[in-house]
From Swiss-Prot:
<dbReference type="GO" id="GO:0006616">
    <property type="term" value="P:SRP-dependent cotranslational protein targeting to membrane, translocation"/>
</dbReference>
<keyword id="KW-0997">Cell inner membrane</keyword>
<feature type="transmembrane region" description="Helical">
    <location>
        <begin position="385"/>
        <end position="405"/>
    </location>
</feature>
<protein>
    <recommendedName>
        <fullName>Protein translocase subunit SecY</fullName>
    </recommendedName>
</protein>
<dbReference type="InterPro" id="IPR026593">
    <property type="entry name" value="SecY"/>
</dbReference>
<keyword id="KW-1133">Transmembrane helix</keyword>
<dbReference type="GO" id="GO:0005886">
    <property type="term" value="C:plasma membrane"/>
</dbReference>
<keyword id="KW-0653">Protein transport</keyword>
<dbReference type="GO" id="GO:0043952">
    <property type="term" value="P:protein transport by the Sec complex"/>
</dbReference>
<feature type="transmembrane region" description="Helical">
    <location>
        <begin position="212"/>
        <end position="232"/>
    </location>
</feature>
<keyword id="KW-0811">Translocation</keyword>
<dbReference type="InterPro" id="IPR002208">
    <property type="entry name" value="SecY/SEC61-alpha"/>
</dbReference>
<feature type="transmembrane region" description="Helical">
    <location>
        <begin position="125"/>
        <end position="145"/>
    </location>
</feature>
<comment type="similarity">
    <text>Belongs to the SecY/SEC61-alpha family.</text>
</comment>
<keyword id="KW-1003">Cell membrane</keyword>
<dbReference type="InterPro" id="IPR023201">
    <property type="entry name" value="SecY_dom_sf"/>
</dbReference>
<feature type="transmembrane region" description="Helical">
    <location>
        <begin position="149"/>
        <end position="169"/>
    </location>
</feature>
Amino acid sequence: MAKQGALSALSNGGLSELWARLRFLFLAIIVYRIGAHIPVPGINPDRLAALFRQNEGTILSLFNMFSGGALERMSIFALGIMPYISASIIMQLMTAISPQLEQLKKEGESGRRKISQYTRYGTVVLALVQAIGMSVGLGSQGVAFSNDFGFYFVAVTTFVAGAMFMMWLGEQITERGVGNGISMLIFAGIVAGLPRAIGQSFESARQGDINIFALIGVGLLAVAIIAFVVFIERGQRRIAVHYAKRQQGRKVFAAQTSHLPLKVNMAGVIPAIFASSILLFPASLGSWFGQSEGLGWLQDVAQAIAPGQPLNILLFTAGIVFFCFFYTALMFNPKDVAENLKKSGAFIPGIRPGEQSARYIDGVLTRLTMFGALYMTAVCLLPQFLVVAAHVPFYLGGTSLLIVVVVVMDFMAQVQSHLVSHQYESLMKKANLKGYGSGMLR
């Protein structure tokens, strides 16, 4: 009886960590959603609503989607997580081209902490630039009640503090919750806006502004995209690997056959988020500073890279392709994999171990990455054309669907991993307790 109680306590203790992580995740999302509804002092809500009605369907809609609706409320989280994402992109690019940062990255945990510290400094700088631009834009367009230094100081301080809190919250979710914190915050913002967008679509269809058949077609397209994304994200290219017969001491290991799994889309949803962030930064500057005297060309730039424009499509496609290859290269090194296979006595049939195996794996990975980049571009851009043509809210775009589906799949995979890990630990502890009990009987 005592032994069964001990086993039950061990099992419950294992699952309690998962429940604690889930509770922290939900609490963090609740805090994020509460903050998204706290407005910055000194904002005229009527003028703000009129401003967003004028800019409906522009790049601001995408910016508002990533901020979870905080931008249109001009809340303390209006900048969202984009300054941190932009700083992360810059730091990763600099790490790839700077020998000093590359060496710092190889120093282990201390080096990674140093790079994270540099990323935070970059986040402060970018958030400050965007906060100043947003505050000046609000003042020049009459959205602020009083266009004085007091408003600018309070607004800039609030925006920067909100962006830094979002960065901290995302890091805490990654460390103490489940899933990638940044992706979870973006996911929460998109999902929070979906009910409103769907309700507006049905209301527009009821009033005759949208063809009901077009709305049904968009809904079926969304279901098809979700199924397609799940199919591709679960897809793998398996490279056959053989282990030769070997002997270690007195033990003889028979020849074995295994495989090296390579995901079709190894970069996940990161390229879509990074490419969107690259477009959002200059577009946001153009939207806020474009009204100022002598800076009208910035507004022309913002209009040129608005959703549906040829330049937007070209830059977005180039960004996705670049970040697919860049992020895959950061995550997976064919030379290291080939070297590890050689050290373990494994080889790819028909391929010489070492350099030839590395070139073969790199070739397979390049083809997979190109297919993954084309798949992600199609998912993000094709629905955008149909959504714009049917005048459906931007929330139903391909980028948002891709982020939602991939984040949910990653979340479920991590929960399953925690469950399997705890079951394994429970079995091992159970075996140890049985061995201890039989020893006591002797």
